[in-house]
Amino acid sequence: VDDTQAHQPQEAHEPDEAHEPDRPCPAHAGSTGSGAPRHYLTTTIPYVNSRPHLGFALELVQADVLARHHRRLGHRVRLLTGTDENSLKNVLAAESLGVPVRELVDRNADAFAALHGPLSLSPDDFLRTSSDPRHRPGVERLWRACAANGDLYRKHYAGLYCVGCEQFWSEEELDGGRCPEHGTEPHLVVEENWFFRLSRYAERLHALVTSGRLRVEPEARRNEVLAFIASGLRDFPVSRSRERARGWGVPVPDDPGQVVYVWWDALGNYITALDYATDGAAYRTWWEGGDRRVHHVGKGVVRFHAVHWPAILLSAGLPLPTDVLVHGYLTADGRKISKSAGGGAADPVELVGRYGTDAVRWWLLREVPRTGDVDFTEERLAARYDTDLANGVGNLVSRTVAMVHRYRDGAVPQAPLPDCAAVAACGEVAVQVSEALDAFDLRRATGAVLRVVEEANRYVESVRPWELARAEGGGDRRAGGRLDESLAVLVHCCRTLGRELAPFLPDGAARIAARCAGSTLAPPVPLFPRLSGPGGGG
């Protein structure tokens, strides 16, 4: 695979793009044009020792929602994802399979890039650390900048290393002598490496996180970072011997016997993808000139992103991220879903094949709490889809369209909207979604959208359009006017759902918008067919 051809960076999404469903929406307050806020959003980059699992799909979908939301506000957005290919665990995985490392990383990197279609993701760039020509020179430049600041030095070291998470652990950090992330016993590594003077930055990092200039959400993760800093920061190794790395990775500048430690290499992707090596226009626009630089990360790597990475940037004299948004883990039977666990239930592409993109995205956004982990089962996925989308959103839209056809031959009444709870919910939802997403609370954001469904259903049961139609048929002209009003309210609610669901369910939202567009509606068709149980649904 020639990565320079397979994954060319796209132009970042600009606010005047007209593609559905991320176009700027008048219902949301937001700047447009060249002076619009610039949001640079990133995911972590996964190791490619195996194929993707549902746990990483969670992070991709969350970041995609934020990107689509900001585009809809008229903001300029660049969303980066990619793959972390210069790790020892990739080398060991290739050895265990008896294949060249290049063959393994190419094959699995393609599998990660292929998630974008099934999950309806909208990244602007995809960087592969082993083959993208932007990456290595950027890593080298970052190394030299920290060296020039006096923050890199060599020393002999002995430490307990977990290959699974590619990091050293102190004995106090281990859980019964095992890695707290992987449950495996780390092995002793003794060699001479380059170290970074992390201890030099403890006070500055503490001040940045405490003040909110480096925002870590949710609060529990911020407190965890502050406690880690307060416990005393130790300098950490940033290289490994070329021999232990099997010759795979980025050589340390001016020291060919050492390879850059995978975490330094991987963290650098956030700026190397912007042509940091050459001070490119993308770097100046999105990192130096960006209004927000947002990292989406899992809880297991928050220290690297909220402590190690900012310290490296401080050393190099570069701008820091503005936000580190931290999610929990997906578990299966109480155990973290990971590539090593295997199993089809953890494969996002297989899940999409069985249940559809809307079902998978919705479960990840609706079920996962702001803080903590959640256990995944296919039964829970199907039940959540049926409850919220088939019986909720889909049923409301289908019911509304059917009544417009039954009572008005498909023509949407042009009646003024009354002062009622359903209309009020439509007017409030945009702000509620924005506030929830700004707090990185996707469950609250999706709940705000579902409130429109709840109020619309209450409205239907209150006004009972079928009784108004019966009265109109008996000659009651006032009932006919109220029927027009009620149908106008319900169509308004459905159109609001099509708009507000767009960041969360781009495919489903587009179907709703198309079904409810225009002055005359097309006949009803199921938008979210039920996955299980009896009955129809939307």
Which sequence ranges carry the predicted segments?
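Aromatic-residue-lined binding/catalytic grooves and analogous aromatic/hydrophobic interfacial grooves
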Residues: 402, 409, 442-443, 499
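N-terminal Rossmann-like or analogous alpha/beta NTP/dinucleotide-binding catalytic cores
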Residues: 2-3, 25-152, 163-166
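A glycine-rich, aromatic-flanked flexible loop/lid motif
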Residues: 364-370, 396-407, 416-429, 448-463
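Structured secondary-structure scaffolds
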Residues: 25-28, 33-73, 77-81, 136-138, ...
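Basic, alpha-helical terminal appendages of large translation-related enzymes
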Residues: 1-7, 20-38, 78, 82, ...
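Cys/His-rich short segments
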Residues: 148-206
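Long, non-coiled-coil amphipathic alpha-helical linker/lever segments
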Residues: 430-443
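Short secondary-structure capping/junction motifs at helix and strand boundaries
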Residues: 119-127, 147-160, 172-173, 187-189, ...
